[in-house]
A protein has these predicted regions:
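N-terminal module-boundary/linker segments of secreted carbohydrate-active enzymes
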Residues: 2-51, 336-339, 526
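Structural recognition of the beta-strand scaffold that forms the well-ordered cores
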Residues: 35-41, 70-77, 114-119, 150-155, ...
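Aromatic-lined carbohydrate-binding/catalytic grooves of carbohydrate-active enzymes
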Residues: 53-163
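Extracytoplasmic
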Residues: 168-325, 533, 544-563, 586, ...
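Aromatic- and carboxylate-lined catalytic core of secreted/periplasmic carbohydrate-active enzymes
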Residues: 221, 226, 230-237, 411-423, ...
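C-terminal beta-strand-rich structural cap/linker in extracellular carbohydrate-active enzymes
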Residues: 316-317, 579-605
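Glycan-recognition surfaces
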Residues: 326-332, 336-456
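Carbohydrate-binding surface patches
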Residues: 444-447, 452-454, 502-553
Length: 605
């Protein structure tokens, strides 16, 4: 991938800035959706999906009655397009989809299903096809509207402003600030002349005088480096930590005045060290550009940046949040075009940037869901091969790597925001036992994750083991409950704070609690490990209220119930338990087989 010579768009509106990420303002799209349910071609067929296979999947969805359970989207993933644009427009691969996308849309809609497609905010798709949306947003949205799509998944490969997957490594100049050694301030007199001294003669500040915020940056060799945002495609950083870093200098002045700021910096083009600098005093921005035209140098800049300081204490912020801001802007551009061209259309927008820029912080502004990590598997299937996945494995490619991150991200999800997406379901792929499949389904339902099937549905028959798992109405009801609350982990056998501690050691049992719209609570005991766990765990109504009471329909009614109706959502066994027995024993489990779960719906009576 070649290095781009142009620069990212100038941010004219502060609503796209990092400082606005927590303000709750939705920029584009509709809220109030429950997690999407359907089928996506990628895990089943990779880039080998075609018209015949897609029609067969749509037919099978109806034959199996999956639409009656809520699986309504049929999504064409990567590999469906021609390798290049035709007269500036997207076109179908003539061999794979000879009838074209409109015919595919008509076929899927004729089944009463909804039609989804795929693209990328980069200049290519992840498969390398040179048909990414960047620069073609309005043309592409026109085509998608013409094809009557109901859903779009948008990837993040070949991002021209990030050193993301398949992108130019030198794009790090856009995603990280220069390494900072210090600053110098020169006061500008009212006549426009510069004074070499501030009050008390102090004009220079070394990095030791500053303060690093967040967990990404650190001091090395007298420089602050890593001024930017953690790459969230890796599982190394907790999603509930402060993932972006700035360098702050507190400066006290005796009067309002203008100053020229000189930044003693080192510009590079590698992960953690870049060339793009943002300068603000408080929330007022004064600079947002490459610090020098030629990066990858060891020189310090003598470029003055004019700023205003107010009488008293000022916080000068040196930072680069463009990794997040550029990505938000790219996704927003697509949504803006949809809204401009067809505001009446209801198109579900699935952000697939793999957690790269921490989209749980900004994704709600433009999307209905956002991927939180790299792919759950890179061993996808093909026609005749179901593909392979691991329960646990190296780095990100496993069921538990996705779960371990998503399980502490509940506060970022909701009907007013959207949903954390730990990738598509891998039920039916090689490497998964029946027990794993059940627990995987439980996890995704409790976490309010999108339920997108990723298997060759021709391998499923009514009432076989796979069918019974993916059509478990009691589990689906948790995911689609109208209260729209992701479960919270309220206990873990690791003995740490359960709701926010990022755990990657799978030798444990977790307990998740999910409030439901009828006043009941779903409680799931999950053995995350590959071995039998002997733990005896008891959960009281009071503990449930402590963690999720603020989101329950009526927490006091739940705690003070005289009895409880308890249903096992896998065995379907039901019992009524008196309050005094619950007070003595709690809702409990004694031992769980490897990768197994006990999931209960508890109804106060």
């Amino acid at each position: 991938m070649s290095e781009h010579k142009i620069k990212p768009v100038t941010i004219q509106d502060d609503k796209y800035r990092f400082d606005a990420f927590k303000n709750g303002e939705v920029l584009f799209g509709k809220k109030g959706r429950l997690p999407a349910m359907g089928w996506n071609s990628w895990n089943a067929f990779g880039s080998g999906n075609n018209e015949e296979l897609t029609k067969a999947m749509a037919d099978k969805m109806i034959e199996l009655g999956l639409d009656k359970y809520g699986y309504i989207y049929v999504v064409l993933d990567d590999g469906c397009y021609a390798s290049k644009r035709v007269d500036g427009h997207l076109a179908s691969d003539a061999e794979k989809f000879p009838s074209g996308f409109m015919a595919m849309s008509d076929y899927i809609h004729s089944k009463g299903l909804k039609y989804g497609m795929y693209n990328d905010v980069g200049d290519r798709l992840c498969s390398g096809l040179e048909v990414g949306t960047v620069g073609y947003e309005e043309i592409d949205c026109q085509d998608y509207i013409k094809w009557k799509i109901d859903y779009i998944k948008v990837d993040n490969c070949y991002n021209i402003w990030d050193n993301a997957t398949f992108s130019c490594p030198k794009n790090a100049k856009y995603t990280f600030a220069p390494d900072i050694k210090g600053i110098k301030l020169v006061k500008v007199s009212k006549e426009g002349m510069k004074s070499s001294n501030l009050e008390m003669g102090v004009t220079k500040y070394s990095i030791s005088d500053g303060k690093i915020t967040g967990e990404r940056a650190y001091i090395e060799g007298g420089y602050a480096t890593g001024i930017g945002t953690f790459d969230g495609t890796s599982p190394d950083a907790s999603p509930v930590s402060e993932l972006s870093s700035e360098v702050h200098f507190n400066v006290n002045v005796s009067e309002d005045a203008e100053y020229d700021l000189y930044v003693d910096a080192r510009c590079r083009t590698r992960e953690g060290s870049g060339g793009w600098l943002q300068v603000a005093v408080g929330t007022s921005y004064y600079y947002d550009d490459l610090l020098v035209d030629s990066v990858d140098t060891e020189i310090c800049t003598d470029k003055p940046i004019r700023i205003k300081l107010s009488k008293g204490e000022n916080v000068i912020r040196l930072m680069n949040h463009r990794r997040q801001e550029n990505t938000l802007t790219s996704y927003a551009k697509i949504q803006e075009c949809f809204e401009k061209l067809a505001p009446e259309k209801d198109i579900l927008f699935s952000i697939c940037e793999w957690g790269k820029t921490q989209p749980h912080n900004w994704g709600y502004k433009v999307g209905d869901s956002w991927r939180i990590l790299n792919d759950i598997t890179f061993q996808v299937g093909s026609d005749g091969d179901p593909g392979t996945v691991s329960w646990e494995g190296a780095y990100t490619t496993s069921v538990t790597a996705q779960y371990n991150k998503a399980v502490i991200m509940d506060e970022f999800a909701g009907l007013d925001k959207g949903w954390n997406d730990p990738d598509m379901l891998v039920i039916g792929m090689n490497g998964m036992t029946d027990t794993m499949n059940k627990t995987h389904m439980t996890m995704w339902c409790m976490l309010n994750s999108p339920l997108m099937l990723g298997m060759d549905l021709r391998r499923v028959e009514k009432n076989d083991d796979i069918y019974k798992i993916i059509t478990n109405e009691d589990l689906i009801a948790l995911n689609q409950d109208t209260l729209g609350v992701q479960a919270k982990r309220i206990f873990t056998s690791k003995g740490v704070k359960p709701d926010t501690t990022y755990l990657r050691d799978n030798d444990r049992v977790d307990v998740l609690a999910k409030p439901l719209s009828d006043g009941s609570v779903a409680l799931s005991f999950i053995n995350v490990s590959l071995g039998f766990r002997e733990d005896r765990i008891s959960i009281s109504p009071e503990l449930i209220r402590e963690y999720i009471g603020g989101k329950m329909k009526d927490a006091d009614n739940f705690v003070n119930a005289s009895k409880y109706k308890v249903k096992n959502l896998w065995t379907k066994e039901e019992s009524v338990v008196e309050a005094n027995e619950v007070a003595e024993k709690g809702f409990n489990v004694s031992g769980l087989a490897a990768t197994d779960n006990l999931t209960l719906r508890i109804i106060p009576m």
